[in-house]
Amino acid sequence: SVGFKAGVKDYKLTYYTPDYKTKDTDILAAFRVTPQPGVPPEEAGAAVAAESSTGTWTTVWTDGLTSLDRYKGRCYHIEPVAGEESQFIAYVAYPLDLFEEGSVTNMFTSIVGNVFGFKALRALRLEDLRIPNAYVKTFQGPPHGIQVERDKLNKYGRPLLGCTIKPKLGLSAKNYGRAVYECLRGGLDFTKDDENVNSQPFMRWRDRFLFCAEALYKAQAETGEIKGHYLNATAGTCEEMIKRAVFARELGVPIVMHDYLTGGFTANTTLAHYCRDNGLLLHIHRAMHAVIDRQKNHGMHFRVLAKALRLSGGDHIHSGTVVGKLEGEREITLGFVDLLRDDFVEKDRSRGIYFTQDWVSLPGVLPVASGGIHVWHMPALTEIFGDDSVLQFGGGTLGHPWGNAPGAVANRVALEACVQARNEGRDLASEGNQIIREASKWSPELAAACEVWKE
């Protein structure tokens, strides 16, 4: 017959290719697919590959004007999920040509843009991505990375300490700056704007930036250490965001901050480029991540958002605390913590890593442990996260019965005690509480903190 064969045809005829050998330049995705009852897994997997690449619901004559074989996504492997009924991991390979260079935005629009509302699927979750070297190389990545940050701050051989200034909303700029000064003076390396502190009626951004810079320089002069405050540059428009970053640079401060999910990847990459060009470190907060990553069977795993951030650019990113949670969660969290810091990460399903990822010397990102932690957690945090991390104690500093500066002292003493004990070969996991107790004998600030938050 003349012409093409019109009509709706099964996706799996075109997009399910179990014999396909993946290319080094392909972007690989692992999806957790929950098909609707009656939809075979091959069809569901193929549908995901089709809808997130070249497919549409019916055959169109313009298909003849291009080479589908060159541009289509392919579902190349499907495996059932152990212990789950009717859940499958579908592996999809995308040819590199489908993506714009250096654009996380375009990568996500393609891979997760449309397909999550697909009728044949009950639920869909993107578990992991393998970014090929050829694509990684089109990104600048983190503005500076772990080593450059240590050199800028002159801080080595230990995790860095931070604190989010609370109450997060309602303080005037001057009182806010005062809290910043007290924490830094007490011994923290960083203080932090809360993620929702942008520029509100009770405290406009410019006033906050000025008072925080003043606090920072005063604390720096008195302690002889380099200090930082994450000035949140997140704003309603990219122009306004850059304006704030420029002002931060003019004040000479070391670091600014961005909410990368609410701000969006385009804004984040823009800011990351500015930060590298102007010597600013960039702290990233993950506000809104749970909207995307909390459901076990739908959405995107945080390790994908973390990989995307390393491409887009950031020097620190919040990544959970691990402490006091389930053992399994610890392995998974350490999996994406390594994906943030290391140059090369092996596939390891027990840690949730579906693909071997080579970052081809893209700088690393410091993971930030933040939320509900206090001095008794210090040994565990030091052991789990190691030196290349930022430990943030908000309430764990400001909640100290004697005030902010003693709270900061308590945290710094606890950290130094843990690092020293570890370097002497002691086991932080089993002797942690004892190490803290010994240290509190000669630090009244730490002793008071130990009283407030029981082990």
From Swiss-Prot:
The modification N6-carboxylysine is found at residue 192. Its EC number is 4.1.1.39. One of its GO terms (cellular component) is chloroplast. Substrate binds at residues 114, 164, 168, 286, 318, 370. The disulfide bond which can form in the large chain dimeric partners within the hexadecamer appears to be associated with oxidative stress and protein turnover. The modification N6,N6,N6-trimethyllysine is found at residue 5. Mg(2+) binds at residues 192, 194-195. One of its GO terms (molecular function) is ribulose-bisphosphate carboxylase activity. Coiled coil: none annotated. Belongs to the RuBisCO large chain family. Type I subfamily. RuBisCO catalyzes two reactions: the carboxylation of D-ribulose 1,5-bisphosphate, the primary event in carbon dioxide fixation, as well as the oxidative fragmentation of the pentose substrate in the photorespiration process. Both reactions occur simultaneously and in competition at the same active site. This is Ribulose bisphosphate carboxylase large chain. It comes from Lupinus albifrons (Silver lupine). The gene is rbcL.
